[in-house]
Amino acid sequence: MKMDNKRRDAIVQSFNSRWKYRYDKDQYGMADAWKIIYTPDIEGNYVGDCEDYALSILYRLCDESHIKMWWLLITHQAGICLVGRKNKWKVSHAVLRYKGEYVDNWTKKFGPKSEIEKNHHFHVFHGYGWAYMTALKMLISKIVRTLKK
């Protein structure tokens, strides 16, 4: 799964042009919902929060293949890293790590870890983007969203 930076950046730029931030509480009525945004809303925007942004970018970088996406997560070539504003123990934001570079809905472009660290601290445990954490968060939020219906 080889992708040059030009194509990678074009995918991110295309997604960014239609991205609209919305808190999970406002969108789903729950504090945390990890979800891939597959389709735009009625206004043509991809709507979600930082976790949704990271997951949705990764999914698109993997040619919209769940198998490729989970392969990258399991082999630690990609990860959804949790970061915080105040210290390495409090989590308040999610960042995509993809093949050694990072992107989030604040920077909106790939860059080094140091770019993210200007505003955030990587969580002492969950800042590495382990696949099990992503799987658990996605599963739990799917169950909660389903039960709320």
Sequence positions of predicted segments:
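A structural boundary/capping signal
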Residues: M1-K149
